């Protein structure tokens, strides 16, 4: 089964926009879980412009599914927060402080020493680790050398090319997933996945364990309601059965 982890940064942005608690982030997280999501993802940044560190602390106390914290480990405050809250998974992302959104993966060879040290720090506390990477075989080989448990494939390129040529858009990701599987790495994916492009991606990437989706899902919830939207994404992940033995795809709808 492919897990759906809902990134709630957009809800936190609205909640914190006026210094209050409307909408109530924790209650919305609980509802998302009740509607069937398998996990909650947060991406706290040092300036706390989306979700605050205190938000993360409160979520950890109360949610009943996996908590995935994303962020840049070169920020000491991020490392401290992760060690304090002890999430189920930490996803290391090479974004800068003022960056609007994540837009590239790690150069795992260049950053090998730093990443290995950081991953060991989290692993020693029992936290599953994941590295945000481009669909590049060399970077995936480098990721393996750091001791990380998983990679998260940065899917913006797939999403932007999907409508033009799905098979071409996904090719590099299939090659990357095959290499990761050969190396014993599990695979997560995220960035710009939505109801249109998610089923094809999920059907054609082997060993895919989790997708993290925030912007598109929260946007869809404005139109369809949160409960309906969460269920639409869960259905999107199950829309196709991918049979590795026969290489056949069967439409469930």
Task: List each model region and its residues.
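Conserved N-terminal beta1-alpha1 strand-loop-helix module at the mouth
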Residues: 1-68, 73-74, 81-87, 142-145, ...
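Hydrophobic faces of well-ordered beta-strands that scaffold small-molecule active sites
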Residues: 2-8, 40-42, 67-71, 90-92, ...
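Glycine-rich phosphate-binding active-site loops on the catalytic face of alpha/beta enzymes
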Residues: 92-99, 150-161, 208-226
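Alpha-helix-loop-beta-strand connector modules within alpha/beta enzyme cores
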Residues: 49-71, 110-127, 168-189, 233
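Catalytic cores of alpha/beta
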Residues: 75-84, 136-146, 193-208
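Histidine/lysine/aspartate-rich catalytic loop segments that bind and position anionic ligands
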Residues: 128-180
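Glycine-rich beta-to-alpha transition loops that act as phosphate-gripper elements at the mouths
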Residues: 50, 69-75, 131-137, 189-196
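C-terminal helical cap(s) of enzyme catalytic domains, especially alpha/beta-barrels
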Residues: 104, 165, 220-241
